[in-house]
């Protein structure tokens, strides 16, 4: 091997690193050994030549990907700097532009709410809304939600078969399993294609079911050796490109990466989703696989994947599939806004802002976020999901259980107190341009509009709103959300369903979304400059300008009730479609106060579970998320959402200009008094 490396290095002339050369030679040797083992010595030369051609082809693709991503990152950096300039022009605070890109802000400059957070929710709920609607239409929703045992394994095999270049079919699978597998494959493929458009390079994984999920608690409990012994014979190392002599090292690094949440490159440097989502691979073979723990685990058969998932994963194909969709949506949003290296992009924009405004002490203080409610580090940790690393530790599990018991003990009557949502709905409808009487009429009727069944329910699902119960994410309305999967979380989901808070919230969100989509549909015949000022302002904050509106209004269609709606799925332009999805989802969360990444960044400050500070802050803010959200999304929007730089400036504009704030305070006070009578 050393002689080969020396010869190759001489010919290489420094174009590849020693690690990359070593990897290529290892691959060629593995091909040679495989031919010898199969008694095909006469084919060794041609096989090695073919393998070399494949590596060369992959190297060329890698160079093209790297070039594409460099160009995309330059454009995204320019857009971010333009966003900070717009923020500076309107508010005098350029740092709000970077905050807007991460978690969104209330100031109404263009792009202020088109954030990583809103896009993540928009993309994910566009997938999940369509998925749920398709499952309901095929009468498979109940089976999807309750998959287990032999039926679940059949669906896994169907999904794995569809992920082949030439599907062979699964003869022993039932008709329901085949139909369900096809629906899941439709959205899995859509998510993969969208990721590739955003900057990734993900090829078809032969026989793949879904991305492997891992229960770190179980893995830590059994230890490295037992985990390796169990998974060793279930993985297809040839498809992953792992040479036989490197299997042990790969499994060691995979175990460390999974239980710690920190992946490492061959040199031992940490690689996380923050700083590397879609690596522009510089080594030829690295395009097809990475030897480090960032490689995707590929199982030999769907049954091998299923057995592993039952023992060390989510133990649920449904949960693993939805987790895969959510991860894809998050990565798509991160790359769309921050490029292929989010951490580096945030750092670079900050440095440029510090250099640009180094002579302005007030702006520089805001850029460095001294004593600020939201730091860029905390915001980035929220949108990447890294703030949840450590949720598998014993400390995190125990305290999560305690908080869950407290939640069920103290929020039994939360449904009654949720009547105050009506006031927030009316206030947000005021911001959207409705009159005071119309806004309150909309607020009282929203829940009834959202309770409709049949075609209207299917139609509402495809808008991607009011799906929290289906997706198992509900307690975050009232808690500083800590996503710890397990039986306790399932009990909480059942609890909120039984105390009626879940159906109340979902119905209100569906109703509000139908109203907003109807507003947009009615105005779709008008040019952008002819739209009402309030509607034009809202569209602008989601990145929909005059050109975008011309594309968006092509999606206006009649709904099942005969009314005109702007349907995101009918919009031909992909990015405008996602912006409209983000608008609908975010406006529903503003109307029925639901915390987003911005509110969680304020509460959790970037501290992870399983640490002293992380657990303390989660207890401190356990029942504070609703109040904080009401201030940031309710009052805050009316205070800063019309362009005022300070509270004083907005309040000095008079009663009419502050009707939203007055309506929120008076409405919640009256409804709160009403609730206290029960």
Describe each region flagged by the PLM.
Residues 185, 194-198, 210, 220-257, ...:
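N-terminal extramembrane/targeting module of integral membrane proteins
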Residues 194-212, 268-277, 340, 344-349, ...:
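Short glycine-rich, low-complexity/disordered patches
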Residues 2-190, 204, 216:
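Low-complexity, small/polar and acidic-rich linker and loop segments
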Residues 168-173, 187, 195, 202, ...:
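Short linear interaction motifs
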Residues 296-416, 420-677:
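Hydrophobic, often aromatic-rich secondary-structure segments at membrane interfaces
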Residues 149, 207, 268, 561-562, ...:
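Intrinsic-disorder/low-complexity loop/linker signature
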Residues 141, 145-256, 424-427, 457-464, ...:
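Structured, mid-chain assembly/scaffold modules that mediate subunit interfaces
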Residues 6-66, 70, 236, 243-310:
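Short, compositionally biased small/polar motifs
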């Amino acid at each position: 091997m050393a002689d080969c490396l020396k010869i190759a290095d001489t010919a290489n002339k420094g174009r590849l690193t020693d690690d990359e050369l070593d990897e290529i030679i290892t691959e060629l040797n593995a091909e040679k050994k495989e031919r010898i083992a199969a008694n095909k010595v006469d084919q060794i030369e041609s096989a090695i030549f073919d393998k070399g051609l494949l590596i060369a082809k992959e190297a060329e693709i890698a160079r093209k990907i790297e070039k594409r991503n460099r160009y995309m990152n330059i454009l995204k950096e320019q857009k971010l700097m333009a966003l900070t300039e717009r923020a500076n022009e309107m508010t005098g605070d350029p740092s709000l532009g970077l905050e807007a890109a991460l978690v969104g802000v209330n100031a109404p400059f263009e792009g202020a709410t088109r954030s990583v957070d809103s896009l993540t929710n928009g993309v994910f709920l566009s997938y999940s809304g369509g998925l749920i609607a398709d499952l309901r239409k095929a009468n498979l929703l109940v089976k999807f939600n309750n998959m287990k045992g032999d039926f679940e394994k059949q669906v896994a095999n169907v999904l794995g078969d569809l992920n082949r270049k030439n599907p062979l079919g699964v003869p022993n699978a039932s008709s329901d399993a085949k139909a369900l597998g096809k629906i899941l494959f439709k959205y899995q493929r859509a998510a993969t294609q969208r990721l590739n458009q955003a900057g990734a390079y993900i090829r078809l994984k032969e026989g793949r079911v879904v991305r492997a999920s891992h229960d770190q608690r179980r893995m830590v409990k059994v230890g490295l050796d037992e985990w390796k012994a169990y998974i060793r014979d279930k993985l297809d190392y040839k498809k992953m490109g792992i040479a036989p002599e490197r299997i042990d090292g790969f499994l060691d690094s995979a175990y460390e990466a999974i239980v710690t949440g920190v992946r490492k490159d061959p040199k031992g440097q940490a690689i996380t989703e923050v700083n590397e989502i879609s690596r522009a691979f510089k080594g030829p073979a690295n395009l097809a696989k990475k030897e480090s723990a960032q490689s995707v685990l590929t199982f030999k058969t769907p049954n091998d994947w299923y057995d592993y998932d039952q023992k060390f994963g989510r133990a649920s194909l449904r949960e693993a599939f939805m987790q895969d969709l959510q991860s894809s949506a998050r990565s798509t949003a991160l790359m769309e806004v921050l490029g292929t290296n989010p951490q580096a992009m945030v750092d670079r924009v900050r440095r440029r802002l510090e250099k640009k405004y180094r002579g302005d002490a007030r702006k520089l203080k805001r850029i460095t976020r001294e004593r600020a409610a939201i730091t860029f580090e905390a915001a980035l940790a929220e949108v990447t999901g890294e703030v949840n690393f450590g949720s598998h530790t014993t400390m995190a599990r125990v305290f999560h259980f305690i908080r869950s018991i407290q939640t069920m003990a103290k929020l039994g009557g939360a449904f009654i107190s949720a009547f105050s949502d009506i006031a927030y709905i009316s206030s947000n409808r005021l911001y959207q341009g409705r009159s005071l009487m119309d806004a309150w009429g909309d607020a009282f009727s929203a829940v009834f509009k959202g309770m409709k069944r049949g075609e209207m329910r299917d139609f509402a699902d495809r808008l991607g709103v009011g799906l929290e119960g289906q997706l198992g994410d509900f307690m975050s309305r009232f808690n500083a959300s800590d996503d710890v999967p397990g039986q306790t979380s399932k009990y909480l989901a059942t609890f909120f369903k039984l105390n009626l808070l879940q159906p109340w919230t979902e119905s209100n969100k569906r109703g509000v979304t139908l109203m907003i989509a109807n507003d947009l549909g009615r105005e779709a015949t008008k040019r952008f400059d002819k739209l009402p000022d309030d509607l034009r302002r809202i569209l602008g904050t989601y990145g929909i300008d005059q050109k975008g509106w011309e594309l968006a209004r092509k999606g206006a269609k009649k709904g099942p009730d005969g009314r005109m709606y702007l349907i995101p799925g009918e919009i031909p332009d992909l990015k405008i479609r996602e912006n409209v999805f983000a608008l609908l989802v975010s406006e529903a969360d503003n109307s029925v106060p639901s915390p987003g990444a911005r509110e969680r960044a304020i509460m959790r400050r970037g501290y992870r579970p399983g640490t002293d500070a992380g657990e303390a802050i989660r207890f401190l803010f356990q029942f504070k998320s609703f109040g904080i959200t009401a201030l940031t999304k309710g009052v805050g929007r009316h205070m800063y959402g019309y362009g005022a730089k300070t509270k004083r400036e907005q309040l000095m504009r008079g009663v009419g200009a502050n009707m939203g704030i007055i309506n929120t305070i008076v409405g919640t006070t009256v409804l709160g008094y009403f609730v206290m009578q029960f």
